[in-house]
């Protein structure tokens, strides 16, 4: 389903693993060069600065082309303009497929920009050709192409868009069921976020879905944030008051407020504790960030101190928390340490041996097993830090 060449994607991961191993002095330069020659990558993926430049250039060209189109159909009706916009989005999509299939672009900035503009013009075109669409309809309209683009291109932004629009479908569909549904909405969103977190954690371990690992990681972070936001007192009170017209007065609480205060205070602590227990840096860092949300929420409704003192107190709490976590992890506890590896990519890459074995079994003709790489005198394959 994914548009990029599978073999090149696998070889890219292997090469990145080899570079990480080289930086950690686990293999020699000759061995790293041998891996690179044995597993060539036929993809164009420039560095970050060139990628940003190509993205901006593609955006300018795409918008200029659309501007010329607008001048040509200036006197057309809104529906005709929508049809032309839809055609233009399909042209952009065709260009995207061409750049990937023929020019071998992979996260070069050009394909990233074309993905965004293609889905953007598609959604705009449907809105122009249709009567006003409800929030539920908009969520469905965005989810369908975003999910397709996620499967087709493994794009991180499309993963986030598909996930959020799916939650939008649930949200706007569920609140139509009445007041009880509105009251239960925070708990439903928390449940969905928790289920999403468990599923993407399982998906990251599935070798068949290895090319979507970055998407899984992004959804994992989003699900943790949404789980907390759906249980945060400030978010629940203000969103409910705004969307459901509760007409709450200043100082007036929502029903069951104590439940959300408990979630507000305990979830970040739970994130931090579980992050330490599971050696999960995403849980740990998210929990540390959410400590600031606790301070903000408490300060917003309870003016126990001037703003400057409250902010200083919150900062001191976060610094002390980070300090004690650092001290706890020095020396390393149970294979978990505060120290950064030489190459951060080691935390997110797949197991090299698994990929080599997979490629070996996918060969049309059987090949003789090769001798493992020599790491400092011992034989065996390098393993990344992936659990």
Feature roles, as predicted:
Residues 2-387:
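Alpha-helical multi-pass membrane segments and their bilayer interfacial helix-loop junctions
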């Amino acid at each position: 389903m994914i548009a990029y060449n599978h073999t090149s994607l696998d070889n890219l991961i292997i090469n990145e693993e080899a570079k990480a191993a080289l930086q950690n002095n686990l293999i020699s330069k000759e061995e790293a060069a041998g891996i690179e020659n044995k597993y060539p990558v036929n993809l164009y993926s420039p560095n970050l600065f060139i990628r940003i430049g190509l993205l901006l250039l593609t955006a300018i060209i795409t918008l200029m082309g659309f501007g010329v189109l607008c001048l040509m159909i200036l006197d057309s009706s809104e529906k005709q303009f929508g049809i032309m916009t839809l055609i233009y989005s399909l042209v952009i999509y065709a260009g995207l497929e061409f750049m990937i299939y023929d020019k071998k672009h992979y996260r070069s900035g050009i394909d990233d920009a074309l993905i965004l503009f293609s889905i953007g013009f598609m959604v705009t075109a449907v809105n122009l050709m249709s009567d006003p669409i409800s929030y539920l309809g908009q969520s469905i309209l965005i989810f369908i192409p975003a999910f397709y683009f996620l499967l087709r291109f493994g794009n991180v932004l499309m993963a986030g868009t598909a996930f959020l629009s799916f939650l939008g479908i649930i949200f706007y569909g569920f609140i139509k069921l009445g007041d009880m549904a509105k009251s239960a909405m925070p708990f439903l969103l928390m449940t969905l976020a928790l289920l999403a977190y468990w599923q993407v954690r399982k998906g990251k371990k599935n070798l068949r879905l290895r090319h979507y690992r970055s998407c899984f990681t992004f959804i994992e972070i989003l699900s943790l944030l949404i789980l907390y936001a759906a249980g945060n007192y400030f978010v629940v009170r203000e969103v409910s008051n705004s969307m459901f017209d509760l007409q709450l007065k200043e100082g007036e609480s929502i029903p069951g407020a104590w439940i959300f205060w408990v979630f507000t205070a305990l979830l970040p602590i739970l994130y931090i504790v579980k992050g330490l227990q599971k050696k999960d840096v995403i849980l740990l860092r998210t929990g540390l960030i959410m400590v600031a949300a606790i301070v903000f929420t408490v300060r917003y409704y309870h003016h126990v101190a001037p703003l400057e003192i409250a902010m200083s107190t919150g900062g001191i709490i976060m610094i002390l928390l980070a300090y004690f976590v650092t001290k706890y992890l020095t020396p390393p506890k149970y294979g978990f340490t505060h120290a950064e590896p030489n190459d951060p990519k080691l935390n997110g890459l797949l197991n090299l041996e698994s990929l080599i074995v997979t490629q070996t079994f996918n060969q049309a003709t059987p090949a003789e097993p090769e001798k493992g790489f020599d790491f400092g005198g011992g034989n065996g394959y390098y393993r990344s830090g992936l659990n």
